[in-house]
Amino acid sequence: SGKANYVFIASMDVDPEKEAVFNEVYDKEHIPLIQKVPGVVSARRNVLAPLKMFIGGEVKTIVAEGEPKYSAIYELENPDVLTSEAWAKAVDAGRWPSEVRPYTRNRRHTLRKLTND
C-alpha cells in the first residue's frame, strides 16, 4: 500500500450485553475486511484509557466527557477510499451490519488530513 495522507477515525459505544460479539466481529471480520480495501494503509482499534498528564506544571486527571469507549483509526492514501465500492462492500460484509451496528451508539466519524511526514 501507499503513503498515508489522511486518518479516518470511527468511534462508538456499544450496548454492554453486545460487547463480546462487538469485539469478536470487529477484530476477526470488520478490521481484516477493511484492511484489504485499496487505499487503506492501516487499520487499528483502540479503547479509551484513563488519562493523567502534566499540564501547567502539575499532574491533572483528564476526563473525556461523552467520548466514545471504542475507536478505530484507519490510515488512508486519500479520502476517496471512503466512497469507493470496495469500502462500501467491506463495511457491510459479515456480521457487522446485522449483529453489531444496531447496538452501537454515540457514533462519531472524523477525517483528518496529515500535515507532516
Question: Language-model segments: what does each one mean?
Answer:
Residues 1-117:
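Macromolecular interaction modules
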